């Protein structure tokens, strides 16, 4: 949601007035939520411009009025969801210029400058160098006081000052003033509402003086001379109190601390501890070794017994194999002998047949 100033037409050209009325043509981009009511969309857009600095106008927009929609229908460009439309509007613009006389109400006083509010909203400042030399800053009351007339500049004082410089940033402007010209600038009144609003925030504390203690010292030093007087401020609740006893104690030289008891030296035999630890470690290692040996011997015995069992079984298997082999050989021999005998008988029969 954006706005762009297309053209500016100043209607009034005042010489000494810091407000200027301008007729402006604006190009607005309204979001899709304002499709049902374009008037409410333009109003919310213009409300965002109020009390903001615009470089095209050269000042701060104070108010707007006479809004006219020049387009009957809103336009949508390409694939943008925003609604484009043009309007004419009148702006009241605050445009201070150099050497102009403005009135402001003091909202803060410090040793370096005075801060003011112009028309209740716009900030301005007057540095100490631009304040008349007859005014001096009083730390006890936190205000500038005229030595001759006893006039004071405090929170809530109305001042007429001359504009020296106007600096602008993105949204605001800063005004720097001067009140050394006594013919056109100076104190013009007091605003009690502003003093109640800002006065309690910037009180400076004063150092309290204990009356009894210093009066005694003063009487002893002056020997009856009553030229110096001290004000008793113990009953004043608005003044913060500071203790001077702590300052005196800090000025005194520190007393040395004497230690009567001799420090005891604690001897630690690190080697003996190490030896003990080693012996314990050796004992534990021996025990572990013995246990390991026993376990290994048991394992060996088991393995040997298993091996012996296996060897006996192998022997039995081998013997059975040999017996089987021998029996198989004998059977084969018998078969051969029988086969040979049969063959011989056959031959004999054949011979007989031939003879016949």
Swiss-Prot record:
Induction: Up-regulated by phagocytic stimuli. GO terms for molecular function: DNA-directed RNA polymerase activity; nucleic acid binding. It comes from the Eukaryota. One of its GO terms (cellular component) is RNA polymerase I complex. Disulfide bonds: none annotated. It holds the Pfam family S1. Residues 253-297 have a biased composition (Basic and acidic residues). Residues 211-356 are annotated as: Disordered. InterPro entries: NA-bd_OB-fold, RNA_pol_Rpb7-like_N_sf, RNAP_I_Rpa43_N, Rpb7-like, Rpb7-like_N, S1_domain. Belongs to the eukaryotic RPA43 RNA polymerase subunit family. Component of the RNA polymerase I (Pol I) complex. This is Probable DNA-directed RNA polymerase I subunit RPA43. It comes from Dictyostelium discoideum.
């Amino acid at each position: 949601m954006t706005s762009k100033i297309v053209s500016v037409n100043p209607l009034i050209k005042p010489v000494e007035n810091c407000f200027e009325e301008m007729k402006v043509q604006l190009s607005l981009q309204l979001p899709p939520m304002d499709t049902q009511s374009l008037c409410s969309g333009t109003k919310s857009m213009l409300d965002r411009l109020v009390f903001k600095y615009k470089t095209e106008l050269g000042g701060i927009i104070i108010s707007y009025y006479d809004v006219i929609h020049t387009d009957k229908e809103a336009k949508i460009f390409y694939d943008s969801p925003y609604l484009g439309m043009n309007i004419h509007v009148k702006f009241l613009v605050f445009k201070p210029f150099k050497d102009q006389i403005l009135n402001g109400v003091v909202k803060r006083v410090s040793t370096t400058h005075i801060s003011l509010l112009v028309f209740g909203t716009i900030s301005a400042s007057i540095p100490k160098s631009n304040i008349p030399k007859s005014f001096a800053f009083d730390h006890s009351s936190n205000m500038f006081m005229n030595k001759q007339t006893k006039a004071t500049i405090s929170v809530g004082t109305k001042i007429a000052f001359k504009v020296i410089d106007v600096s602008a940033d993105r949204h605001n402007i800063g005004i720097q003033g001067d009140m050394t010209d006594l013919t056109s600038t100076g104190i013009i009144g007091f605003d009690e509402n502003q003093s109640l609003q800002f006065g309690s925030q910037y009180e400076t504390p004063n150092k309290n003086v204990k009356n009894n203690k210093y009066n005694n010292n003063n009487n002893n030093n002056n020997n009856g001379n009553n030229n110096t007087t001290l004000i008793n401020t113990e009953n004043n609740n608005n003044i913060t109190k500071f203790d001077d006893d702590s300052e005196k104690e800090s000025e005194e030289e520190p007393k040395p601390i004497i230690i009567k008891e001799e420090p005891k030296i604690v001897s630690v035999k690190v080697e003996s501890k190490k030896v003990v630890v080693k012996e314990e470690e050796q004992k534990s290692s021996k025990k572990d070794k013995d246990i390991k040996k026993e376990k290994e011997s048991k394992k060996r015995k088991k393995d040997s017994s298993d091996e012996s069992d296996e060897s006996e079984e192998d022997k039995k298997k081998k013997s059975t194999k040999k017996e089987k082999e021998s029996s198989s050989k004998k059977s084969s021999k018998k078969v051969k002998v029988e086969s040979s005998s049969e063959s011989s008988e056959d031959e004999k029969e054949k011979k007989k047949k031939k003879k016949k």
